[in-house]
Design a protein with these regions (language model features):
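Sec-dependent signal peptide recognition
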Residues: 1-7
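Sec/Tat signal peptide C-region and signal peptidase I cleavage site
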Residues: 14-20
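Flexible loop/hinge segments at secondary-structure junctions
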Residues: 20-185
Protein backbone atom coordinates (compact mmCIF):
# COMPACT_ATOMS: atom_id res chain seq x y z
CA UNK A 1 0.00 0.00 0.00
CA UNK A 2 2.86 2.36 0.85
CA UNK A 3 4.44 1.72 -2.58
CA UNK A 4 1.08 2.48 -4.25
CA UNK A 5 0.80 5.81 -2.38
CA UNK A 6 4.34 6.79 -3.41
CA UNK A 7 3.62 5.81 -7.03
CA UNK A 8 0.35 7.77 -6.97
CA UNK A 9 2.14 10.82 -5.54
CA UNK A 10 4.79 10.50 -8.27
CA UNK A 11 2.07 10.36 -10.90
CA UNK A 12 0.58 13.64 -9.65
CA UNK A 13 3.97 15.32 -9.47
CA UNK A 14 5.02 14.21 -12.95
CA UNK A 15 1.68 14.69 -14.71
CA UNK A 16 1.46 18.00 -16.56
CA UNK A 17 -1.27 20.12 -15.10
CA UNK A 18 -3.10 22.97 -16.74
CA UNK A 19 -1.27 26.10 -15.76
CA UNK A 20 -3.26 28.11 -13.27
CA UNK A 21 -2.62 31.79 -13.90
CA UNK A 22 -3.40 34.62 -11.60
CA UNK A 23 -5.87 37.17 -12.89
CA UNK A 24 -5.71 40.76 -11.72
CA UNK A 25 -8.09 43.60 -12.34
CA UNK A 26 -7.31 47.27 -12.22
CA UNK A 27 -8.93 50.57 -13.08
CA UNK A 28 -7.97 54.20 -13.25
CA UNK A 29 -6.05 56.73 -15.26
CA UNK A 30 -6.49 56.75 -19.02
CA UNK A 31 -3.29 58.75 -19.53
CA UNK A 32 -0.93 55.75 -19.10
CA UNK A 33 -3.34 53.11 -20.45
CA UNK A 34 -1.41 52.50 -23.70
CA UNK A 35 1.85 51.69 -21.89
CA UNK A 36 -0.04 49.61 -19.32
CA UNK A 37 -1.66 47.61 -22.14
CA UNK A 38 1.77 46.88 -23.57
CA UNK A 39 3.24 45.92 -20.20
CA UNK A 40 0.30 43.65 -19.35
CA UNK A 41 0.45 42.01 -22.79
CA UNK A 42 4.18 41.32 -22.35
CA UNK A 43 3.60 40.04 -18.82
CA UNK A 44 0.92 37.58 -19.99
CA UNK A 45 3.14 36.45 -22.87
CA UNK A 46 5.84 35.54 -20.34
CA UNK A 47 3.36 33.40 -18.37
CA UNK A 48 2.77 36.12 -15.78
CA UNK A 49 -0.64 37.08 -14.48
CA UNK A 50 -3.37 38.15 -16.87
CA UNK A 51 -4.33 41.74 -16.14
CA UNK A 52 -7.61 43.39 -17.08
CA UNK A 53 -7.16 47.17 -16.84
CA UNK A 54 -10.05 49.57 -17.42
CA UNK A 55 -9.07 53.15 -18.27
CA UNK A 56 -12.01 54.82 -16.52
CA UNK A 57 -10.23 57.90 -15.16
CA UNK A 58 -8.24 58.49 -11.99
CA UNK A 59 -11.25 59.32 -9.83
CA UNK A 60 -13.20 56.20 -10.81
CA UNK A 61 -10.12 54.01 -10.44
CA UNK A 62 -9.46 55.37 -6.97
CA UNK A 63 -13.07 54.71 -5.96
CA UNK A 64 -12.97 51.16 -7.38
CA UNK A 65 -9.79 50.43 -5.41
CA UNK A 66 -11.24 51.82 -2.17
CA UNK A 67 -14.47 49.86 -2.78
CA UNK A 68 -12.34 46.72 -3.37
CA UNK A 69 -13.88 46.00 -6.77
CA UNK A 70 -10.40 45.90 -8.37
CA UNK A 71 -7.00 44.63 -7.25
CA UNK A 72 -5.25 47.90 -8.02
CA UNK A 73 -6.02 51.46 -9.01
CA UNK A 74 -4.01 53.91 -11.06
CA UNK A 75 -4.03 57.68 -10.90
CA UNK A 76 -1.96 60.53 -12.23
CA UNK A 77 -1.66 61.91 -8.73
CA UNK A 78 -1.03 60.19 -5.38
CA UNK A 79 -3.88 59.41 -3.00
CA UNK A 80 -4.52 61.93 -0.25
CA UNK A 81 -4.60 60.84 3.38
CA UNK A 82 -8.42 61.04 3.53
CA UNK A 83 -8.64 58.40 0.77
CA UNK A 84 -5.78 56.33 2.17
CA UNK A 85 -7.71 56.12 5.46
CA UNK A 86 -10.59 54.43 3.57
CA UNK A 87 -8.38 51.60 2.29
CA UNK A 88 -8.78 48.51 4.49
CA UNK A 89 -6.41 46.07 2.78
CA UNK A 90 -3.13 47.94 2.65
CA UNK A 91 -1.72 50.32 0.11
CA UNK A 92 1.56 50.90 -1.68
CA UNK A 93 1.85 53.89 -3.99
CA UNK A 94 4.42 53.50 -6.76
CA UNK A 95 5.24 56.03 -9.50
CA UNK A 96 4.82 54.05 -12.73
CA UNK A 97 5.48 56.39 -15.63
CA UNK A 98 5.80 60.02 -16.59
CA UNK A 99 4.40 61.88 -19.53
CA UNK A 100 3.55 65.21 -21.03
CA UNK A 101 0.29 67.02 -21.63
CA UNK A 102 -0.05 68.88 -24.90
CA UNK A 103 -2.63 71.03 -26.62
CA UNK A 104 -3.96 69.14 -29.60
CA UNK A 105 -5.88 71.01 -32.28
CA UNK A 106 -7.57 70.36 -35.59
CA UNK A 107 -7.37 73.34 -37.90
CA UNK A 108 -5.64 72.48 -41.19
CA UNK A 109 -3.53 75.33 -42.49
CA UNK A 110 -3.09 76.89 -39.07
CA UNK A 111 0.46 76.67 -37.72
CA UNK A 112 -0.33 77.26 -34.08
CA UNK A 113 2.31 78.24 -31.53
CA UNK A 114 0.60 79.26 -28.30
CA UNK A 115 2.09 81.37 -25.57
CA UNK A 116 1.31 80.32 -22.02
CA UNK A 117 -1.11 83.23 -21.68
CA UNK A 118 -2.91 82.24 -24.89
CA UNK A 119 -3.24 78.67 -23.60
CA UNK A 120 -4.85 80.00 -20.42
CA UNK A 121 -7.23 82.22 -22.40
CA UNK A 122 -8.27 79.39 -24.75
CA UNK A 123 -8.99 77.06 -21.81
CA UNK A 124 -11.01 79.76 -20.04
CA UNK A 125 -12.99 80.68 -23.16
CA UNK A 126 -11.58 84.21 -23.38
CA UNK A 127 -10.17 83.35 -26.81
CA UNK A 128 -13.00 81.77 -28.80
CA UNK A 129 -12.00 82.42 -32.39
CA UNK A 130 -9.02 81.06 -34.30
CA UNK A 131 -8.45 84.55 -35.76
CA UNK A 132 -7.28 85.72 -32.32
CA UNK A 133 -4.42 83.21 -32.66
CA UNK A 134 -3.41 84.26 -36.19
CA UNK A 135 -5.48 81.68 -38.07
CA UNK A 136 -8.55 81.94 -40.31
CA UNK A 137 -11.68 83.52 -38.83
CA UNK A 138 -13.74 80.66 -37.39
CA UNK A 139 -15.16 79.56 -34.06
CA UNK A 140 -12.76 77.75 -31.71
CA UNK A 141 -14.31 74.98 -29.61
CA UNK A 142 -12.43 73.97 -26.47
CA UNK A 143 -12.50 70.24 -25.65
CA UNK A 144 -11.75 69.06 -22.11
CA UNK A 145 -12.12 66.10 -19.79
CA UNK A 146 -15.54 65.61 -18.23
CA UNK A 147 -14.52 62.93 -15.73
CA UNK A 148 -12.33 63.15 -12.63
CA UNK A 149 -8.82 63.10 -14.01
CA UNK A 150 -5.27 63.34 -12.73
CA UNK A 151 -4.40 64.76 -16.15
CA UNK A 152 -6.85 67.61 -15.53
CA UNK A 153 -5.22 68.22 -12.16
CA UNK A 154 -1.76 68.44 -13.75
CA UNK A 155 -3.10 70.61 -16.57
CA UNK A 156 -4.90 73.06 -14.27
CA UNK A 157 -1.85 73.27 -12.00
CA UNK A 158 0.15 74.32 -15.06
CA UNK A 159 -2.45 76.88 -16.15
CA UNK A 160 -2.42 78.42 -12.68
CA UNK A 161 1.38 78.58 -12.72
CA UNK A 162 1.34 80.16 -16.20
CA UNK A 163 -0.89 83.11 -15.36
CA UNK A 164 -2.47 85.01 -12.50
CA UNK A 165 -5.54 85.42 -14.72
CA UNK A 166 -6.37 81.69 -14.37
CA UNK A 167 -9.52 81.69 -12.23
CA UNK A 168 -10.83 78.13 -12.59
CA UNK A 169 -8.76 76.70 -9.77
CA UNK A 170 -6.99 73.36 -9.86
CA UNK A 171 -8.02 69.80 -9.36
CA UNK A 172 -9.15 66.57 -10.97
CA UNK A 173 -12.34 68.32 -12.05
CA UNK A 174 -13.04 72.02 -12.58
CA UNK A 175 -16.11 73.94 -13.74
CA UNK A 176 -15.11 74.65 -17.34
CA UNK A 177 -16.99 77.77 -18.51
CA UNK A 178 -16.94 76.73 -22.18
CA UNK A 179 -16.32 73.81 -24.44
CA UNK A 180 -17.22 70.19 -24.93
CA UNK A 181 -16.39 67.57 -22.31
CA UNK A 182 -15.45 63.97 -22.95
CA UNK A 183 -14.23 61.01 -20.91
CA UNK A 184 -10.64 59.82 -21.17
CA UNK A 185 -7.57 61.17 -22.89
Amino acid sequence: MKAFAVALLGLFVLTPVAEARTRLSGAGASFPSKIYSRWFYDLAKEKGPRVNYQAVGSGSGRKAFIDETVNFGASDDPMKQKDIDKVTRGLVQIPMTGGTIAFGYNNPGCDLKLTQQQAVEVAMGIIDNWKELGCDDQKLTWAHRSDGSGTTKAFTNSMQAFSETWTLGTGKSVAWPVGVGGKGN
